[in-house]
């Protein structure tokens, strides 16, 4: 399903999803309805650290959510109604940008402090290693992985792809969304049940998204 938020097709900036939940930073009915319908999740509507861009600000898997200590107490209360939440003090506050994870493992921005990587891995019960995707450090925007498959920036190299596939436990294909956007995490939200993409995604791109996420 294709959606835009007030004309913006970068829907991955506004939402973060797991197998059971989605956190959405804007009270935008078309996006919320699409996520509920296609991903079969309960939706939590809240900002993170005062920002609508929750896709950039938080990490999420079936174990729970990770946010920085910039999160507001009212936002934290909203999240904790449904999720276990780990709050970490770190200068690298955009966990959604800097972590690429599923329920098995993932990649962290190579500049993330090792102590933070360890805390996240322990809390989320995953194998987490530092790395890049297509040379990009903001790995959470450079690719999307679910428990079934993954779609990565077309510039990912063989070594990066092998590393990601090993830790996430899924095969990863390369592609774009939104008519050529290679930062696929900015325009795609997905779990093992379905996906929603930005409105500008072409039919050709959709075919690759389908093949990547549902092999």
Swiss-Prot record:
Organism for this UniProt entry: Archaeoglobus fulgidus (strain ATCC 49558 / DSM 4304 / JCM 9628 / NBRC 100126 / VC-16)
GO terms for biological process, alphabetical: cytosolic ribosome assembly
Family annotation (PANTHER family): TRANSLATION INITIATION FACTOR 6
SMART domains the UniProt entry points to: eIF6
Phylogenetic placement of the source organism: Archaea, Methanobacteriati, Methanobacteriota, Archaeoglobi, Archaeoglobales
Transmembrane segments: none
The encoding gene: eif6
Gene3D superfamilies named in the record: L-arginine/glycine Amidinotransferase, Chain A (3.75.10.10)
Entry's family note: Belongs to the eIF-6 family.
Record's signal peptide: none
InterPro entries documented for this protein: eIF6
Claim: Transcription regulation is one of the keywords in the record: no
NCBIfam families: eIF-6, PRK04046.2-4
One GO MF term: ribosome binding
Function: Binds to the 50S ribosomal subunit and prevents its association with the 30S ribosomal subunit to form the 70S initiation complex.
Coiled-coil stretches noted in the UniProt entry, renumbered to this chain: none
Alphabetized UniProt keyword annotations: Initiation factor, Protein biosynthesis
Pfam families reported for this sequence: eIF-6
Protein name (database record): Translation initiation factor 6
